[in-house]
């Protein structure tokens, strides 16, 4: 009886050893971490099933790739002329998308969702206001539209992780501050005024997602959705695209979750934004911080450098890594070992 038992032991031991020595590349050799091409545009998926690849695409738009799943957090690939170009077109981002999660119904967060969803068959998730507009385009089948309110029980399962909708809050920046900021940016701009073609381009984009006065008001408190990502191996992430005050739903979530490994944390409004952004940092205690809605504008608003914010994060969470990645740069995290790699 001992020989068969020994044989079984050896088979199990060899199997475990083979898994431990699986020929996965290190992060600095992982193909998905060495390219600027998003997976949605035909770039490679990570070879290591434990590796998460994240790319900033502008404003609050991020691509998240894990195993065979490609998710867009917000979907506005086309950019207004006063944002730095990401050198991508909406059509290019239709090679592989499994789901689109929309934060709220302002155009720069969702105006390309119908096109991308139609061409990829991706599920499109968002609040009632955002999904009302998406449905009105007639490009997405009702079966692929998921309307959420973020009040619990709205979870979407993928290969190795799930995404839960959580009620958020849109940022509230005083009008007089915004007026002064725009005037200052206009006064010191080095890029010159927008060309007629740029003005036409921006007019088209700005008119794509019309909202009523009632919708604009409801969007602030009821129409902003954050998302909690729970991985099967225990890795946790949180995404929100607007820097409003933290909500009861977000606080209830963190009473259960404790802290997150990766936080997509909102930063909008320059120096005024640091206190509210730090409210998110204190609540979620992320090990890695990636900002949302932080990129600067030409002839519209003053730049919002993340240096002062990152210093505040370091002062309270010295072990946290606060990163403001360049457009399309791969940020790779091994969700088991927590190793972090930032590409070029």
Feature locations, PLM:
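Bacterial N-terminal signal peptides
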Residues: 5-15
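Boundary at the C-terminal end of the N-terminal hydrophobic targeting segment
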Residues: 18-22
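Flexible, acidic/histidine-containing loops and adjacent segments that form or flank the divalent-metal
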Residues: 27, 147-226, 232-235, 321-344
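Pre-active-site segment of Zn-dependent metallo-hydrolases
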Residues: 33-49, 57, 61-106, 111-118, ...
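Active-site neighborhood of phospho(di)ester-bond hydrolases with catalytic His/Asp-centered motifs
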Residues: 59, 72-76, 96-106, 125-128, ...
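Active-site environment of divalent metal-dependent phosphoester hydrolases
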Residues: 80, 106-111, 131-134, 152-154, ...
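Active-site-proximal loop/helix segments of hydrolase catalytic cores
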Residues: 84-85, 203-283
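Binuclear metal-ion centers of metallo-dependent hydrolases, dominated by the metallo-beta-lactamase
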Residues: 131, 136-159, 278, 282-344
